[in-house]
Amino acid sequence: MTKRITTIKEMQHLSRTRKAHNKQIGFVPTMGALHDGHLQMVKQSIADNDYTVVSVFVNPLQFGPNEDFDAYPRTIEEDEAQLDALGADYVFYPSVEEMYPKPLELSINVHRMAEVLEGAKRPGHFDGVVTVVNKLFNIIRPDIAYFGKKDAQQLAIIEKMVEEFNHPITIRGMDTIRELDGLAKSSRNIYLTDNERQEAVQLYQSLLKAKQLYDAGERSSDVIIDEIHTHLTTHTSGTIEEIAIYSYPELIEQTQITGRIFISLAVKFSQARLIDNIIVEKS
């Protein structure tokens, strides 16, 4: 039975107790509304560790002024039932008041890595992400933490935080979980209309076309980006907000590709903004 924990004090006590008995803790941070991508990470954590903790916390610090924090789906009962079925040990479900009893005097600022891609459109977003993840790491003290490669920029920033702040934690990036037709699983997919849902598969198809170009020897970012743009404008009604190619995990924009990259895109449909990416190894 998955145990719900709502206070920092109890979570810290449990973590200390498990550590004192040389038990390994796996941690999957989420904002809830769990889908198969989250559950795959939970399954991996259960396989890898003695205990698995899943946090469900909608973090206000990572929402901008034009982003509706109150509208984010909150489905703790359904989430808890899914975690219980898998055999997760604990769900850490603190309130905002528990995590932030007073306005923070200190926070973590992400510099260059947050000034591109999603970070450029959402100022302060990654500061909020890194601040809460840092707090969660200190509360739960995991040995391994699991993050999805679907949010590749976030993964790269978390890896950098662990490196620079000397957290004794292994970060495990998990492959993007997709629907049978290739659409990346996301809590936002429920906001797509039927027609948009059919079109949304073209995001991944455009990335696969880009990879084919790369594998065939193309190294010009402009050529690859043009191919993605043409495919998306032809096959979807969404607004293309970004197509970019960056080195990974350094997050340096590429004009002439020389090494490991990730190709990222963002498309806005009527009620949902979808992102997707693929990481391409140097051939």
Curated annotation (Swiss-Prot):
Instruction: Name a GO CC annotation attached to this entry.
Output: cytosol
Q: Does the keyword Disulfide bond apply?
A: no
Q: Where along this sequence does the record place binding of (R)-pantoate? A: Q62, Q154
State its Enzyme Commission number(s).
Answer: 6.3.2.1
Tell me the residue numbers annotated for binding beta-alanine: Q62
Cysteine disulfide links: none
The superkingdom of the source organism is: Bacteria
Q: What positions constitute the catalytic site?
A: H38 (proton donor)
**Binding site residues for ATP:** 31-38, 148-151, 177, 185-188
GO BP, sorted A to Z:
pantothenate biosynthetic process
Q: Which UniProt keywords apply?
A: ATP-binding, Cytoplasm, Ligase, Nucleotide-binding, Pantothenate biosynthesis
Q: Which CDD domains match?
A: PanC
Q: What is its main location?
A: cytoplasm
Q: Which residues form a coiled coil?
A: none
What is the uppermost EC class here?
Answer: ligase
What catalytic reaction does the record list?
(R)-pantoate + beta-alanine + ATP = (R)-pantothenate + AMP + diphosphate + H(+)
Miscellaneous remark of the record: The reaction proceeds by a bi uni uni bi ping pong mechanism.
Tell me which family the UniProt entry assigns to this protein.
Belongs to the pantothenate synthetase family.
Self-association and partners:
Homodimer.
PANTHER family the record matches: CYTIDYLATE KINASE/PANTOATE-BETA-ALANINE LIGASE, PANTOATE--BETA-ALANINE LIGASE
Q: Briefly state the protein's biological role.
A: Catalyzes the condensation of pantoate with beta-alanine in an ATP-dependent reaction via a pantoyl-adenylate intermediate.
Q: What is this protein called?
A: Pantothenate synthetase
As recorded in Swiss-Prot or TrEMBL, the protein's gene is named panC
